[in-house]
């Protein structure tokens, strides 16, 4: 049950309690009134008391009955027994009068005889007060009120539903007038920031460009992998320009009702124009911007296409004086419609790549501002351990390292906390309680040592700095490397990487004269590497040809881009590359057989070896 439902139930019961209190209040006072003591007497007794002037007041009810109270004062009462309830229970006397005319004549006679002037009145109706009403009908009235509340709430909910039907076509964008995020909060991304700073300048001083005949860009498309800072960069644009910022996701346009998406697009741009200069940011625009189906296939998403068509017309229908800029982000650039990507809609396409080594260090510095860390922390070493990590990944690493240091009861976060967090992120949680047989443990030690020796010896392999046979995640051991930052990769570098990955299986075969299932991950990676060399990069005897589809639109096609004969050649080339590198790995390990035995036995005993442990031996 959500908080709003709990609040409604709590409010309803408060109302019930309130009505119960009111009912009990009236019931109590009416009960007090009805509990007054009534004494039946005679007419003779009445006139006897009247003659002594002891009657305070009497009332003739419906010409048949007389009700009176005595004129006794508090001093005449027993002071010892007098209390609040005694006062509530003052006696009231009643008697039947019979003939009314005879009774009136007798009253007049006593008035003249005893010279008294009694206080009396005639009432020809039943005494029925508000208290009597609540006493008689209060319970039923309370039930009616409760039912009325239920009905009213139902009508109100129906009314809100009907209002929802009218509001369903309205934009769901969140409007931010002021944003504290600036370009200083966006670490790295120096290239994209420089390109997008011009958009900020357009919003701040558009006349600077329009007076020369230039037109304000209508949109910019941010493209990059998840977590690279596309949304953060868009927020920084709004923060720098200090203009209204409309933020929503592409899926916010999509609804089960026909025509809602187009209506929301229309409403969004209408509001943005009223508040111009402004920025519209559409995250995950591929939800509505996918390429339209050329053939009329049954079951196609016509509603999404209608939404896209409306978005296209709104973006292309901008006036140059509206100062409304559309920013959109996606990690599926390949599936977007060509009409959306053309100039005049998204005039600029900004690619945001995964951060480089320097950018990773800058991102870590931003996230470390809120963390207490040791001054001896090695940011360069940590940054080298996380190639391919996005800004979101680095943020998570910093946070997890702080949590790990807290669990270890440390005052500050140290380098070891970061490294252990990275290992956990890449390899999984360390499994200290898993039982491994001695012969299996020895095989794992030789497997990991084989990786380390080959990566140390061959030229283009990544530098190894630690090997371990401690189970972690789904692996029983691991060799950790410091990857080299590369923008392009040569054929020799790719072959060296394959050779390093085959070093583990080669070491097993060399020592135990058989193979095991422990090389599954290695085999998967080398197969993909060899496939990419042959099919995509043209690094084989097949020639300078590539079957790579950068658009990604033929992923589900049943037709291959090459013949069956070419497919056989590709398979042979892949197999040839892998066999050559496996043979090469065996030769390297045979030449370093003694070192392999020594390091593997040492790893078997210690379970973890660092660069310092095997550097002197391998050098």
UniProtKB/Swiss-Prot annotation:
Residues 1-11, 153-619 are cytoplasmic. Disulfide bonds: none annotated. ATP binds at residues 224-231. One of its GO terms (molecular function) is zinc ion binding. One of its GO terms (cellular component) is plasma membrane. It is found in: Cell inner membrane. The chain crosses the membrane at residues 12-32, 132-152. The keyword Membrane applies. Its cofactor is Zn(2+). Binds 1 zinc ion per subunit. Zn(2+) binds at residues 447, 451, 522. The keyword Transport does not apply. Its EC number is 3.4.24.-. Pfam families: AAA (PF00004), AAA_lid_3 (PF17862), Peptidase_M41 (PF01434). Residues 33-131 are periplasmic. The active site is at residue 448. GO terms for biological process: protein catabolic process; proteolysis. InterPro entries: AAA+_ATPase (IPR003593), AAA_lid_3 (IPR041569), ATP-dep_Zn_Metalloprotease (IPR050928), ATPase_AAA_core (IPR003959), ATPase_AAA_CS (IPR003960), FtsH (IPR005936), P-loop_NTPase (IPR027417), Peptidase_M41 (IPR000642). NCBIfam families: FtsH_fam. In the central section; belongs to the AAA ATPase family. In the C-terminal section; belongs to the peptidase M41 family. Homohexamer. This is ATP-dependent zinc metalloprotease FtsH.
């Amino acid at each position: 049950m959500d908080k709003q439902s709990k609040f409604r139930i709590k409010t309803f019961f408060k109302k019930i309690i309130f009505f119960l209190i009111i009912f009990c209040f009236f019931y109590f006072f009416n009960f007090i009134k009805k509990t007054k003591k009534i004494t039946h007497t005679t007419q003779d007794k009445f006139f006897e008391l009247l003659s002594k002037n002891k009657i305070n007041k009497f009332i003739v009810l419906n010409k048949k009955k007389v009700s009176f109270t005595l004129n006794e004062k508090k001093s005449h009462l027993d002071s010892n027994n007098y209390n609040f309830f005694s006062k509530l229970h003052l006696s009231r006397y009643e008697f039947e009068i019979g003939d009314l005319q005879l009774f009136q004549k007798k009253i007049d006679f006593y008035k003249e005889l005893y010279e008294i002037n009694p206080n009396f009145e005639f009432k020809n109706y039943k005494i029925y007060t508000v208290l009597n009403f609540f006493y008689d009908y209060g319970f039923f009235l309370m039930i009616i009120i409760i039912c009325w509340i239920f009905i009213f709430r139902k009508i109100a909910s129906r009314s809100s539903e009907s209002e929802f039907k009218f509001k369903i076509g309205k934009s769901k964008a969140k409007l931010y007038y002021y944003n504290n995020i600036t370009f200083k909060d966006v670490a790295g991304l120096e290239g994209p920031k420089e390109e997008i700073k011009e958009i900020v300048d357009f919003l701040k001083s558009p006349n600077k460009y329009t007076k020369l005949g230039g037109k304000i860009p209508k949109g910019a498309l941010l493209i990059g992998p998840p977590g690279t800072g596309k949304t953060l960069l868009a927020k920084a644009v709004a923060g720098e320009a200090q203009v209204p910022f409309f933020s929503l996701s592409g899926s916010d346009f999509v609804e089960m009702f026909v025509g809602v998406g187009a209506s929301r697009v229309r409403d969004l741009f209408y509001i943005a124009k009223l508040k111009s200069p402004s920025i519209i940011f559409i995250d995950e625009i591929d939800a509505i911007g996918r390429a339209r189906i050329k053939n009329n296939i049954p079951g196609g998403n016509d509603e999404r296409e209608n939404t896209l068509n409306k978005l296209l017309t709104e973006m292309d229908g901008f006036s140059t004086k509206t100062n409304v800029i559309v920013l959109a982000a996606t990690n599926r650039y390949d599936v977007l419609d060509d009409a959306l990507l053309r100039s005049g809609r998204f005039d600029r396409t900004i690619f945001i790549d995964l951060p480089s080594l320097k950018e990773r260090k800058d991102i870590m510095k931003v996230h470390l501002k809120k963390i207490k860390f040791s001054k001896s922390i090695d940011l360069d070493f940590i940054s080298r351990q996380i190639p391919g990590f996005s800004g979101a990944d680095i943020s998570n690493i910093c946070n997890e390292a702080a949590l790990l240091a807290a669990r270890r009861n440390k005052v500050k976060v140290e380098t070891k906390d970061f490294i252990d967090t990275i290992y956990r992120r890449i390899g999984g949680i360390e499994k200290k309680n898993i039982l491994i047989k001695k012969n299996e443990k020895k095989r794992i030690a030789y497997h990991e040592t084989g990786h380390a020796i080959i990566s140390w010896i061959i030229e283009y392999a990544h530098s190894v700095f630690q090997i371990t046979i401690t189970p972690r995640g789904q692996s029983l051991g691991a060799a950790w490397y410091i990857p080299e930052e590369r923008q392009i990769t040569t054929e020799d570098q790719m072959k060296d990487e394959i050779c390093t990955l085959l070093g583990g299986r080669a070491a097993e075969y060399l020592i135990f004269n058989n193979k095991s299932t422990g090389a599954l991950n290695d085999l998967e990676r080398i197969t993909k590497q060899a496939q990419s060399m042959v099919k995509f990069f043209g690094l084989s005897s097949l020639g300078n040809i590539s079957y790579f589809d950068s658009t990604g639109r033929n992923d589900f096609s049943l037709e291959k881009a090459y013949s069956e004969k070419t497919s056989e050649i590709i398979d042979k080339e892949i197999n040839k590359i892998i066999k050559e590198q496996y043979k090469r790995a065996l030769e390297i390990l045979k030449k370093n057989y003694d070192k392999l035995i020594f390091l593997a036995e040492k790893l078997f005993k210690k379970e973890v070896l660092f660069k310092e442990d095997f550097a002197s031996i391998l050098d």
